[in-house]
A protein has these predicted regions:
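Second-shell loop/turn segments in exported
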Residues: 74-84, 101-108, 134-135, 164, ...
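N-terminal, active-site-proximal structural segment of metallo-dependent hydrolase catalytic domains
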Residues: 18-123, 137
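Solvent-exposed loop/turn segments at secondary-structure junctions
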Residues: 30-34, 111-115, 137-141, 152-154, ...
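Structured beta-strand-rich core segments of catalytic domains in phosphoester-bond hydrolases
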Residues: 105-184
């Protein structure tokens, strides 16, 4: 009996040591998380309470939007406190459903500002989260990348990309340091140009990322919305080409996964979102942990397609699914 008890203690200690050398990460494009205030420096006119949308100026600006869905959002979406709070609650529920208390480090895309990020943080704080980080970028729409972490975040930086083409995109790469078990890890949060823009802009963005990691020897993780469609990936072998520098999450192992985003137009799945771990820096995936995070409230059971947030029913989370993984120090 005593021997069995000692064995159990040793097993628990061994597991604790293993856990101490690992961390979990999540990346999620939250699909337009805005507050309810009108920020004159940002294009947030679609995400305002309906009573703020009655002016002639607002209607004229909305009618200039070419995409019907976005134009209707601008004109008719009632983004009030109740709707905003429902979106926050659903996001928090989605995040916490992973491992019952969320990943250690979360990279988020499409966050308007620190104010709304802090509201989400307050919902997550009881689950061990202690720090957040967001730097306001020059993005024309006013959506930024952000981190929420169970470890302290330091040295936040934005790296803007100079594109070879004439097209301009203002979303930078967001870099932070996070110290875990006395080791600094560089995290890079990405939201690359959308598929509206040519593929060379996403390739330029990856080139900038790869130059950044050459400037230091820290373990590095890059995660976020790469906006690389399955069509472009197949044609240009983009993710495969990154394996010179990185372990690419969904290429390492995600056998039962379809992708993180579903294109209804051509009925295809894509890994717009993924996680990269830099090679040869004593950090690697636990391959069996790599997954696209699905729950009954963030995706349809049969098809697996994401359930976007519906401001009428207040159901759903995002048009993207999160990718998650567990990482381990060598």
């Amino acid at each position: 009996m005593i021997r069995s008890f000692k064995t159990l203690i040793l097993l628990c200690l061994f597991n604790s040591i293993l856990e101490a050398g690992s961390l979990t990460v999540m990346t999620l494009n939250v699909d337009n998380l805005f507050d309810t205030f009108d920020d004159q420096k940002k294009d947030d006119k679609a995400f305002l309470p309906i009573e703020k949308k009655n002016s002639e100026t607002h209607v004229i600006q909305c009618n200039r939007i070419r995409v019907l869905k976005w134009r209707n959002e601008c004109l008719y979406l009632d983004w009030n406190q109740e709707t905003k709070n429902a979106k926050l609650t659903n996001l928090a529920k989605n995040i916490i459903s992973y491992n019952q208390d969320g990943a250690d480090v979360i990279a988020l895309q499409e966050i308007e500002n620190m104010y709304i990020l802090n509201e989400l943080f307050l919902l997550l704080k009881p689950y061990g989260y202690i720090d957040i980080s967001l730097l306001e970028s020059k993005d024309r729409r006013g959506i930024d990348t952000a981190f929420i972490s169970k470890y302290e975040i330091s040295n936040p930086k934005l790296h803007y990309i100079k594109f070879k083409s004439k097209n301009r995109d203002t979303r930078p790469i967001f870099e932070v340091d996070i110290r875990i078990n006395n080791k600094v890890i560089k995290f890079y949060n990405l939201h690359f140009p959308s598929n509206f823009y040519p593929i060379d802009m996403r390739i330029d963005s990856l080139d900038v990322l790869n130059e950044l990691i050459k400037k230091h020897n820290y373990p590095s993780v890059a995660l976020g919305d790469f906006n690389i469609s399955s069509k472009d990936d197949k044609k240009y072998q983009i993710y495969k080409n990154q394996e010179k520098y990185w372990y690419v999450g969904h290429r390492e192992r995600c056998n039962a996964c379809k992708g993180t985003y579903y294109y209804a137009g051509d009925k295809t799945w894509s890994y717009l979102d993924t996680i990269l771990v830099e090679k040869n820096r004593n950090l690697h995936f636990i391959n069996t942990s790599i997954n696209v995070w699905r729950t009954p409230f963030n995706s349809y059971i049969k098809s697996g397609k994401p359930i976007s947030f519906d401001p009428i029913s207040n159901a759903g989370v995002s048009d993207h699914l999160a990718m998650v993984a567990k990482l381990k120090f060598n």
